[in-house]
């Protein structure tokens, strides 16, 4: 049984307040500011979705390969434009044969001992050399041999014109920012640090050991090496 206080809280008409979750969407995912970059914000079309905007800018919004449900774009003549397949994706023999062979007869290779079908010999397993059809050499049964001959052309399709102008601007911006980060900026003494070091020198001169033991001017008990570095910077600024 609940306590009297809990029963009163349940009967109360005062709504229970919940802590507002900032930076999160309703589905619990983290809210991402897609307009954080000035170049992307300038070329962003609010009428399009995130995927459509990224595709138009020549970018990708996911590093993983699409798992289905990708949008099919139609050209003016009515044909459907499909994205090229990933050249690193390894097709199985059944997938490649299922695309080339329909219902009908096919050549198969059986195990001489068990009689089980090892593989189906399709049109892709035969090549024409000097006018004669010969079997494609694949002694290791490498599944990469099942890839189409047009794979290189398909993979080079979207990049045949090179990166877009927006991608080039983003690359130049990234190179500029990385070079600025790589440069190590020297740290200068603040105004309060200058006054503090000057007071220590006026009282103790060059005796750094006495500065370390001074509880009044050195309440944080800075080490001897730290004080020497600060004094050296202070002298460089005075010269």
Swiss-Prot record:
Claim: GTP-binding is one of the keywords in the record: no
Residue segments, region Disordered: 1-23, 132-192, 210-239
InterPro entries linked: Ribosome_biogenesis_Nop16 (IPR019002)
Principal location class: nucleus
GO biological process, one term: rRNA processing
Record's subcellular location: Nucleus, Nucleolus
Listed GO CC annotations: nucleolus; preribosome, large subunit precursor
The family this protein is said to belong to: Belongs to the NOP16 family.
PANTHER family documented for this protein: HSPC111 PROTEIN-RELATED, NUCLEOLAR PROTEIN 16
Binding partners and assembly: Component of the pre-66S ribosomal particle.
Protein name (record): Nucleolar protein 16
């Amino acid at each position: 049984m609940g306590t009297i206080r809990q029963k009163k809280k349940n009967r109360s008409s005062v709504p229970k307040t919940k802590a507002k979750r900032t930076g999160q969407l309703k589905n619990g995912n983290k809210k991402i500011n897609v307009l954080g970059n000035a170049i992307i914000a300038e070329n962003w079309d609010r009428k399009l979705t995130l995927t459509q905007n990224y595709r138009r800018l020549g970018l990708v919004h996911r590093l993983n390969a699409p798992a289905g449900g990708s949008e099919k774009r139609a050209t003016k003549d009515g044909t459907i434009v499909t994205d090229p397949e990933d050249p690193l994706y390894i097709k199985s023999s059944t997938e490649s044969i299922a695309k080339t062979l329909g219902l009908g007869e096919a050549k198969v290779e059986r195990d001489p001992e068990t009689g089980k079908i090892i593989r189906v010999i399709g049109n892709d397993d035969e090549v024409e050399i000097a006018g004669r059809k010969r079997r494609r050499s694949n002694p290791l049964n490498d599944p990469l041999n099942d890839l189409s001959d047009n794979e290189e052309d398909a993979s080079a399709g979207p990049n045949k014109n090179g990166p877009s102008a927006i991608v080039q601007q983003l690359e130049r911006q990234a190179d500029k920012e990385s070079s600025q980060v790589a440069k190590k900026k020297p740290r200068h003494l603040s105004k309060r640090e200058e006054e503090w070091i000057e007071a220590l020198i006026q009282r103790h001169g060059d005796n750094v050991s006495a500065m370390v033991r001074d509880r009044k001017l050195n309440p944080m008990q800075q080490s001897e090496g730290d004080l020497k570095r600060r004094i050296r910077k202070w002298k460089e600024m005075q010269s």
